[in-house]
Amino acid sequence: MMIRRNIMAALLTATAMAGVNATHAAEPSVFPTAPQEPTAVTVAGKGDGRADDSDAIQQALDSARDKTGHGMVFLPSGTYRITRTLIVPPGVRIYGVGPTRPVILLGARTPGFQQGVSTMIVFGGGDQYRVGDVPVPVPTIVPRDKVVRDANSGTFYSAMSNVDIEIGAGNPAAAGVRFHMAQHAFLSHMEFRLGDGFAGVYQAGNIIENVHFQGGRYGIVTEKTSPAWQFTLIDSTFDGQRDAAIREHEVDLTMVNVAIRNTPVGIEVDRGYGDSLWGKDVRFENVSQAGVVISNENNVFTQIGFENALAKNSPVFARFRQSGRTVDGKGDAYKVASFSYGLMVPDLGHVGEYRTDADIEALPALPARRAPAIRDLPPMQDWVNVRTLGIVGDGKADDTAAIQKAINAHPILYFPTGFYKVTDRLTLRPDSILIGLHPAITQLYIPDENPRHAGLGSVLPILESRKGGDNILSGLGLFTGRVNPRASALLWRSGEKSLVEDVKIMGGGGTPTADGKMLGSLTVHTGDPVTDHRLDAQYPSIWVTDGGGGTFADVWSPNSFAQAGFYISDTSTPGHVYEMSVEHHARNEFVLDNVQNWEFLAPQTEQEVGDGPDAVSLDIRNSKNLLFANYHGYRVTRTYAPEKSAVKLYNSSDIRFRNVHVNAESGYATCDDEGCGTFLRASKYPFDNAIEDVSRKLFVREREFAKLDIGAAGRTIPTPTASMAPVEKLEDGFWSISGASVDTKGALYFIDRRFQRIHRWSEAKGLEIVRDQALDPVNLAVDASDHLLVLSSLGPKAGVYSIDPEGPLDQLTLIQPTPVRAAARKRTLLPVNWWNNGEFRDQLDHKSYEFTTLAEMFARDVGTPKAQEYVSPDGSLALPAFRVWQQGPIDHTGWRWSDGLNANGFVSGKMGERIFVTNASENVTYSGAIGKGGALVDLKPFANRGGESVAVDGQGRVFVANGQIFVYGSDGAQMGRIDVPDRPLQILFGGPDKRTLFILTHHALYAAKP
């Protein structure tokens, strides 16, 4: 929310010109009087800068939440000294109110803020997985013995605005705010005066707007956000940090109109990590060492891009940490029109290569700073409270006519918290501005089965704007009800300067309802899950059309009842999307049809297990001149169904993709009888392809890349380099196959898990079904007796059993875990592919101030011996008993997670032998020696591709499945590539001569003889 910054423009310009030691000018209070919110809690502290106001503020925070779990706290003008960490409950927003912006002050040398990292204000979270205990307490609380649950991927709406943070002298460990948030949370209109403190924000999330960081060791230090979505920083400044303005990794940092001054480093990506980093209109002034420090070169997760960056007295634009290579500026002042580093995909149908692209030109002087990306709201004195106009907002009275009358009479309307019932279209004036302060509890909603929205007919939205309008919609929730076929939340025809910000489309996660009922209260039982849950049965939630455009920032659209979350059609008016989350739809999340001149910075989609197995993330039709940067296409870990492509293009051209991230893994924090901890759940069903051009029948298999330009419609696309071996399809028609192994005769065994079938394929007999009992088999191996050792997900700790594929169908041997024992002839089974990440647990060492790297985590975890193992009846195979993490019920309706269950299959070796595995969290293939208890030690990176699987042939060649199959010599040099019609999931050698490379994809089995 941006209010009244324009009055500061001249002062800011003068300050910037005053010299390199100038600081950001103090901004006025954006809420000079308290908004009329009868349910808000006002802090009753002293506010004199001397008294300890910790208790007063905490009491207000603790009492703010209403029965829906949301609320607001008003902090009046004053200086509030605190002596311990303040905890903000989930769903609570803090607004500074009064003629001057209030300050939360950490007094000089406050005990507890001298060592490690200690946070003044922590935004907390709820018990997302109903654990009871707190699996990973926040480690930066003062006092340290206080147990606090961190914000997490289920923490929405929390915010702080119009409050300054100040750190007094002698607090080198102090951080201002921990903001590890999910959607619809923000910090705005703030100034962090950090002195000798550690950082302004430690652990960031969602969006920060119009925030200014002065001093400190760092302005922001952060790992990835709690849901692993993007973090967007808009209209903000950094000045005078001692080490770097921003230190981060994996946070998908997206910057728009950010200025960094008087510091050694602008943005530092931590050692051993990458990031999807995108900066638009970023200024670097007096940045002595590097504008950006890039780590993890030649890794797919390192995606660095800038557009229209400006620099003055900043000689090095980019420095590469490992190689020491630099990309230098040109002269004292220069412009970086474009910069990109990472895996570059030359065109559709091709694989990527690592490259640096930089377009830098010298300037005689820097131009003036651009206008804010988020326009100001009007001053408060112009707001008209709708409650003074006869509008009730009690969730019962029909407010439609009264709201329309108010819109017609007043350009600026303020909606206090409440549920405003709407039964017909509300049409905005060309200059209408509608404002709320908390979308979860300030909703315009349509009641279920409203007569005007029933049956077959054209779209009838809650709000409709006029073509070319100069409108603003801010801080409101819009809910179209459960059953209203003609409904849409917002039909937007407004012009380029219009703004939609802090708006939530209700219907997904975090949806309080006016009737107090669950979203699924009108579920039916036809047998069709889409019909049963009323999915895909309304018009798009947000529909921009007929020349509409403007800026859309911090918008969340997860209403599963709608056909799409964000739909744009028939417009060439420029549009700007910043930090938008569109999720949980049955068919499409984003749809663009006949659209030009739009940019999407940090768009994120998510397909849930129940509503999204068939959903496409981006559907682009008949469109051109588009930019997608820091795009994240995620499918939840519990997904059971494969899906072909995240992005689909139809008759579209001139599209720039920058920093693309397509995945399906997520951290999980819980407690069980083995203790508390975290684990990285990995689905086997991310989108197979990042992009599919339906018109050209071409795909982009790379799921992680820095750059792809979809060129002109009539262009000729070069043919990729030839595959080094032909591929033959052996069988198809499967749901999703993996978990394979071969026997001593070379026959292939594999699992189609959805249908609980264990198959065998051989040249002599073709495809057979060996077993199909309902035992939930996941992975298997063949022992020396040609019996199958099968890992099952059935049971609270999963299970292992053995079967004779030639024996009676009603017999199996259940194998119990036993203490690890050394045996010379025993082969140890290990996952061929691993996922390993530090989500949900801070990785910062509070003494060295270094983060544990992904490689260090991987080496630590795979190098830890397991105490028990599952041994095949003949004693020839041992599967380490990996810890199993349980989510949901203990029967087959719940989920189980472990390194063995996550894997696409197993590899094996004897003690001391070296094997190859992939770490998908780094996308690196390693070799390692098998140690006691299934430990993998003496790890050595082998190749900078490491996705789904790896296999080694009799010549020592190494085959890595990562979109296609990449072939390496034993020395690590790439020899070629085998192209497969579908994405390979598992590869292994078999056949009578052990020279057949079996290739398992979701739906088909292939073979090659390289």
Give, region by region, the residue ranges found by the protein language model.
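C-terminal, well-structured subdomains that either form a transmembrane helix-short loop-helix hairpin
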Residues: Y414, F419, H576-V591, A646-V647
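Active-site-proximal segments of catalytic enzyme domains
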Residues: A553-G565, G575
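Extracellular "leader-to-stem" segments immediately downstream of a signal peptide or signal-anchor
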Residues: R4-P76, I82, I87-A169, A173-G176, ...
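Sequence-structural signature of mature extracellular/luminal beta-sheet repeat domains
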Residues: G711-P1010
